[in-house]
Amino acid sequence: MARKLKAAIIGSGNIGTDLMIKILRHGQNIEMGAMVGIDPASDGLARAARMGVATTHEGVEGLTRLDVFKDIDFVFDATSAGAHVKNDAFLRTLKPGIRMIDLTPAAIGPYCIPVVNGEDHLDALNVNMVTCGGQATIPMVAAVSRVAKVHYGEIVASISSKSAGPGTRANIDEFTETTSKAIEVVGGAAKGKAIIVLNPAEPPLIMRDTVYTLSDFASEDAIAESVERMAADVQAYVPGYRLKQKVQFDRIEASHPINIPGVGPRMSGLKTSIFLEVEGAAHYLPAYAGNLDIMTSAGLRTAEHMATRMLAA
């Protein structure tokens, strides 16, 4: 039987529980070692215990007291941005080389979008998975920017309010800041902006994302082909990821420029509009929670690629 590397998950909420189920069902080089929470009555800890996973409700300090801690190579942090900074610092005092997959917007490590720059950070000790909205939309900004220079990229992520637990709600400000920055650093836009909408509709609506870019004029066919190719790449690990409709284009001529606050008062170029839908795999919450699925799938894919390199060394 092939050797697998053990992982702990900090945060027994929606994201952590969904990720745990993915690892238990689909882990190739990664296996569950421990589930860590702070609420002894949490559903995530109860599920983990039923599935035979070591648990603690005493937070990251409780993790270090578990027998399995000595065998942990990976830690997925699904808490909050502020908590992640402390968790990383604390664990490194005991295991300096531990690999941290940051599922919060803390971003103390490099941003990682698997289909865009995942191969660039396989040796990093801490990688940041940006946000659910970033994982869905930044590949599309990158798809445009590999064809034409993108001056501005704006994304709107709409997720079901029911899929947003207390950790997500506590991170709203960090969500917009981290996603906006990653649109620039990873997506290639000169200026990025991110907006998140928690939709309270009942029954809950599926995750929807809209991406707008303003770029230099370029072949619309080339951009559309690049977008479709990128969507297929994301579908390799998030099967429910899809383009909702054909890519739309508007030519903004220099004779009729537009004003983009923070970018320029007289902007012209090619406006590209991309409409996405992300259906979840329903490993934990129902299929409307595509935001969980894309975040946990990206985190697991990144860890699997890191583990492949570590096991081959």
UniProtKB/Swiss-Prot annotation:
Top-rank taxon: Bacteria
UniProt-recorded Gene Ontology molecular function terms: acetaldehyde dehydrogenase (acetylating) activity; NAD binding
Sites where the protein binds NAD(+): 12-15, 163-171, 291
Cited SMART domains: Semialdhyde_dh
Catalytic activities: acetaldehyde + NAD(+) + CoA = acetyl-CoA + NADH + H(+)
A matching Pfam family: AcetDehyd-dimer
NCBIfam families membership: ac_ald_DH_ac, PRK08300.1
Protein name: Acetaldehyde dehydrogenase
Organism annotation: Burkholderia cepacia (Pseudomonas cepacia)
Gene transcribed to yield this protein: bphG
